[in-house]
Amino acid sequence: MSLIPSIFGGRRTNVFDPFSLDVFDPFEGFLTPSGLANAPAMDVAAFTNAKVDWRETPEAHVFKADLPGLRKEEVKVEVEDGNILQISGERSNENEEKNDKWHRVERSSGKFTRRFRLPENAKMEEIKASMENGVLSVTVPKVPEKKPEVKSIDISG
């Protein structure tokens, strides 16, 4: 993640992408000592930054987020400040029994938030979201491009 602040007021994962506005995580990629890896209550940064693909088609902007193990009730899709698409949610820790002995904790838990500045051609009032098999799909239709009106002129003579 970039340590360079965005000119748009947030932090970006890619300094060349003005639309990516991820929440800054100073511990992203930080390796924990092996002794801490067995602590079941520890939040893991891998889920904090859920992976999202953003594809633009002629008709829409399509976002796909991998959110394995989450139900749609645990995920929020919101538009704030008129053009910021925010995807957020939380995965809870698994219940721990007193007699349980954890050998390895690799599945992540905790909160995540991803934010994207949508371009001016996005139709905010027509955004649709669906979730299937742990993949969130958000479709943001685009305003159709105005094609220049061409008027044919008769040539006399």
Swiss-Prot record:
Start and end residues of each sHSP domain: 43-157
The superkingdom of the source organism is Eukaryota
* Full protein name: 17.6 kDa class I heat shock protein 3
What lineage is this protein's organism placed in? Answer: Eukaryota, Viridiplantae, Streptophyta, Embryophyta, Tracheophyta
Transmembrane feature ranges: none
**Matching CDD domains, A to Z?**
ACD_ScHsp26_like (cd06472)
Give the PROSITE patterns listed for this entry. Answer: SHSP
Where is it localised? Cytoplasm
PANTHER family per record: HEAT-SHOCK PROTEIN 20 FAMILY MEMBER (PTHR11527)
Output a single Gene Ontology CC term carried by this record. cytoplasm
The subunit structure is: May form oligomeric structures.
Q: Which Gene3D superfamilies match?
A: 2.60.40.790
Q: Which UniProt keywords apply?
A: Cytoplasm, Stress response
What coarse category fits the chief subcellular location reported for this protein? cytoplasm
Q: Which family does it belong to?
A: Belongs to the small heat shock protein (HSP20) family.
